[in-house]
């Protein structure tokens, strides 16, 4: 028979499980918040996000609630991307995936073993609603590369904005195959929607993101990979018992780069990277800009290039530099400012040289040693000088 302490422990355990079930069934562990607040209290999930506004990074952070983002592919990168956007308080999130959660996915982030067998979009939506019930999450469990599903995908991003009937603000591609990337590329070119393409290499030690503005920058078909250019069926490249490697670290970094640039684009701060790569072996982050291909195979890309060329160009106004005037007319203490690279003025000359890094200077420089021969004048005396001549020299001294 169980003791009183054991019964109490069982009751506490059951009560804890009941609270979790209630929170899950309600869609979240807290009540919805109508308006974001910058009040610094432990119960405010937006205080640290609103601090970006107070620090002058973002002019109006709450605008993120008026943004709608579509995430295509809820795998290693896509699930973390959706998680980050949900925690940032995005207004609307539309998820696309047709796969199921497997135990083989547990080496990556976000999903848990008890979700194995569930569709990725439903499992993700359940967790994301628990994290932030303020975000409106829509799920689409189908393969966008089929003819029937492509039309549904096209309509979903065309009418999935915050206001009914308006397009989404941004499409994020987090898929793991070229066929799906080409489908997203075609849809966004047709609708003239800006989107981000992302990916991680098969050896899991490199990745990238690419911001595609139809007509302005290169689309995915402008410089396609060999598999796409040669119309090779990706399924024929797969081998039984062989799979691509994956690291949660690389996928987390790529997802972070993707969401960071998404926030910069949606909230208009910083500079959005056209292309940002990542090499984990040497911690290298290459950046570049890609121009559209005038002979691109995608006819919608050609149309968007024509539209972009027909737009009136923005006139650049050259800023006239203002003349710098001294803040104070008088310099009572004789203070002088020198440039950081002015090593001649910042370090005393003592006759000795020290190799130090740029921007550093020595706190103490030892005085140069002086030789007695330099301060006193001596007269050379040769051995063949006579005694009379030597006496004459001594008298003249």
From Swiss-Prot:
Composition skew (Low complexity), residue ranges: 375-384
Span of the signal peptide: none
Coiled coil: none
A GO biological process held by the record: protein ufmylation
Keywords: ATP-binding, Metal-binding, Nucleotide-binding, Ubl conjugation pathway, Zinc
Location of region: Disordered: 362-384
Active-site residue list: 243
SUPFAM superfamilies noted in UniProt: Activating enzymes of the ubiquitin-like proteins
One MF term in the entry's GO annotations: UFM1 activating enzyme activity
Binding site for ATP: 76, 97, 120, 143, 177
Residues noted as binding Zn(2+) in the record, renumbered to the chain: 219, 222, 296, 301
Annotated GO CC locations: cytosol
Statement: the UniProt record of this protein carries the keyword Nucleotide-binding: yes
Gene3D superfamilies, alphabetized: NAD(P)-binding Rossmann-like Domain
Family recorded in the similarity comment: Belongs to the ubiquitin-activating E1 family. UBA5 subfamily.
PANTHER family recorded: UBIQUITIN-ACTIVATING ENZYME E1, UBIQUITIN-LIKE MODIFIER-ACTIVATING ENZYME 5
Protein name, as recorded: Ubiquitin-like modifier-activating enzyme 5
Natural source organism: Aedes aegypti (Yellowfever mosquito)
């Amino acid at each position: 028979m169980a003791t009183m302490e054991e019964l109490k422990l069982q009751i506490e355990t059951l009560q804890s499980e009941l609270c979790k079930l209630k929170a899950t069934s309600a869609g979240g562990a807290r009540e919805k918040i109508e308006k974001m607040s910058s009040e610094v209290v432990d119960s405010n999930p937006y205080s640290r996000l609103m601090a970006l506004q107070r620090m002058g990074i973002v002019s109006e952070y709450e605008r993120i609630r008026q943004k709608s983002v579509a995430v295509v592919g809820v795998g290693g990168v896509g699930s973390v991307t959706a998680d980050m956007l949900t925690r940032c308080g995005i207004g609307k999130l539309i998820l696309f995936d047709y796969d199921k959660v497997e135990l083989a996915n547990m080496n990556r982030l976000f999903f848990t073993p008890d979700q194995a067998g569930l569709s990725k979009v439903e499992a993700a939506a359940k967790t994301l609603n628990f994290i932030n019930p303020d975000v409106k999450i829509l799920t689409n469990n189908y393969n966008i590369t089929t003819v029937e599903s492509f039309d549904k995908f096209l309509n979903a991003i065309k009418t999935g904005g915050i206001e009914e009937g308006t397009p989404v603000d941004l499409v994020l591609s987090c898929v793991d195959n070229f066929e799906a990337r080409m489908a997203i590329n075609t849809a966004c070119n047709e609708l003239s929607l800006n989107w981000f393409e992302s990916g991680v290499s098969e050896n899991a030690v490199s990745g990238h993101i690419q911001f595609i503005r139809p007509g302005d920058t290169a689309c995915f078909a402008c410089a396609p990979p060999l598999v796409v250019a040669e119309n090779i069926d990706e399924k024929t490249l797969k081998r039984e018992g062989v799979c691509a490697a994956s690291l949660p670290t690389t996928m987390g970094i790529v997802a972070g780069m993707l969401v960071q640039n998404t926030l910069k684009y949606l909230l208009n701060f910083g500079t959005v990277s056209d292309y940002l790569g990542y090499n984990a072996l040497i911690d290298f982050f290459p950046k570049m800009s890609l121009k559209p291909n005038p002979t691109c195979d995608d006819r919608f890309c050609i149309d968007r290039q024509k539209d972009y060329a027909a737009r009136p160009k923005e006139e650049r106004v050259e800023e006239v530099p203002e003349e710098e005037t001294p803040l104070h007319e008088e310099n009572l203490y004789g203070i002088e400012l020198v440039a950081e690279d002015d090593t001649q003025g910042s370090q005393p000359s003592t006759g000795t040289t020290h190799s130090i890094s740029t921007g550093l200077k020595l706190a103490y420089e030892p005085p140069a040693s002086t030789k007695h021969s330099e301060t006193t004048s001596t007269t050379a005396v040769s051995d063949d000088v006579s005694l009379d001549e030597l006496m004459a020299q001594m008298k003249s001294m």
